[in-house]
């Protein structure tokens, strides 16, 4: 089959889109030229061809996303902070605001800043969905591995997939007991437990700004199953409870996974150092002193960070509702 693409030189995103097309099959590339090209015109055409060749060459090196995915309040921020501490220079002191960088896409995906940069109408959720992969193409323009936070379900809406192997190298999916998620999430968003459970049970559940939908969560079970069943790239599933109760071995497992899919180097002394730097109590003290951009409506983002807090917070009736609603997944994960 033949497809035709035209190129406007200097548009890196367009070049990348072209490379994606070239990789999928035979292609004819048309570069507009003047009827009587001058020496300067010819030189520019040659430069275009060389530039395309360069882009194709660097695209062969994997420059992909590793998702840091979770339902809200499941340990995503802690994981990002640990990884930031681990991969920064050994003599650098970790600071709470250090995660607010492009390297770790702390604002999450989809990102309002990227939507604005690409002139995508973020007031229409359908436009956000349509451009999921375009935004990921944009992130991957830096030609390196990108850790990207997301609370989005690994879903398909109409013909649009949340991601594919073209942009995704792998992912770490964090899962937490839904009873603890409910307690923590309700404090974060300022809703009562019953209303929060209704949101967590709905397949039509979104993270939104005051004016528009941004992230499709779905129900807690939908979310977990969508990432568990993603087959295009290997996804590592980590329980928040293991992060808390078997911290060193769990983070070692994460780094072993990263060494398998990327070129991460495992250094047990660095793991211990980074765990000390990002210990919950230390993060809590830093937040009290410095504040934290991700804080919701609760007094602190790093509120408790414990496992099993639901036992002292939820009524027996509400606990049973959660266990009935998510019984299959909770049994599978060992929560029941």
Annotate each predicted stretch with a short phrase.
Residues 1, 6-10, 24-27, 34-37:
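Intrinsically disordered, low-complexity segments enriched in small polar residues
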């Amino acid at each position: 089959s033949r497809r035709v693409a035209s190129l406007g030189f200097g548009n890196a995103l367009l070049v990348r889109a072209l490379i994606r097309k070239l990789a999928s099959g035979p292609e004819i590339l048309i570069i507009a030229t003047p009827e009587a090209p001058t020496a300067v015109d010819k030189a520019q055409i040659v430069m275009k061809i060389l530039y395309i060749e360069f882009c194709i060459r660097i695209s062969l090196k994997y420059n992909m996303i590793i998702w840091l995915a979770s339902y809200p309040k499941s340990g995503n921020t802690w994981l990002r902070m640990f990884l930031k501490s681990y991969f920064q220079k050994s003599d650098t002191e970790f600071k709470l605001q250090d995660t607010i960088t492009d390297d770790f896409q702390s604002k999450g995906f989809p990102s309002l800043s990227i939507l604005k940069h690409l002139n995508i109408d973020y007031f229409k959720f359908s436009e956000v969905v349509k451009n999921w992969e375009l935004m990921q193409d944009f992130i991957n323009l830096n030609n390196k591995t990108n850790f990207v936070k997301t609370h989005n379900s690994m879903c398909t809406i109409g013909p649009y997939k949340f991601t594919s192997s073209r942009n995704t190298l792998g992912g770490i999916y964090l899962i937490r007991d839904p009873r603890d998620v409910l307690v923590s999430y309700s404090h974060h968003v300022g809703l009562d437990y019953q209303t929060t459970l209704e949101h967590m049970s709905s397949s039509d559940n979104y993270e939104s700004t005051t004016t528009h939908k941004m992230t499709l969560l779905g129900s807690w079970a939908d979310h977990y199953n969508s990432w568990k069943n993603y087959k295009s790239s290997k996804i590592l599933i980590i329980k928040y409870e293991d992060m808390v109760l078997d911290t060193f071995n769990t983070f070692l497992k994460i780094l072993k996974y990263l060494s398998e899919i990327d070129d991460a180097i495992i250094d047990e002394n660095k793991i211990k150092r980074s765990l000390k730097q990002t210990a919950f109590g230390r993060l809590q003290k830093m937040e009290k002193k410095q504040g934290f951009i991700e804080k919701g409506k609760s007094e602190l983002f790093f509120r408790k960070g414990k496992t099993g807090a639901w036992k002292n917070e939820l009524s027996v009736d509400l606990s049973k509702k959660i266990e009935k609603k998510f019984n299959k997944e909770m049994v599978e994960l060992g929560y029941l």
